[in-house]
Amino acid sequence: MMGKPQVLTFIDWYKPFYKAGGPVRSMVNLVDHLSDRVDFHIVTGDRDYTASSSPSDLRRDQWVTSDRGEQVWYAALKGRTMGRLKQLITERKWDVVYIN
């Protein structure tokens, strides 16, 4: 039996952030409905829309397991480099890379 498809997703904001509205809600809904069949790895920013700083308790620049089992990488501003993006893309074989 084959494992779940591995999906790497890039989105500017993801939960717990919400001020960006629709795109965040759409990604949360996608994970909610497909997490039993798909392994999501989500790369996102470390602060909410229009926020000048990130929450002090947020774990940045590492994979964090969220409530539906999805892995989330909250990228700090200084960590959003082409080198880091390339590293995340090439660290494993993804079945799909989804850029939202």
Segments (PLM) and residue ranges:
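Extreme N-terminal starter segment of soluble prokaryotic enzymes
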Residues: 3-7
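N-terminal strand-loop element at the rim of the active site
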Residues: 11-17, 33-79
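Flexible, glycine- and charge-enriched loops at secondary-structure boundaries
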Residues: 20, 75, 99
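A generic local structural motif
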Residues: 27-28, 59, 82-87
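Short N-terminal targeting/anchoring amphipathic segment
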Residues: 86-100
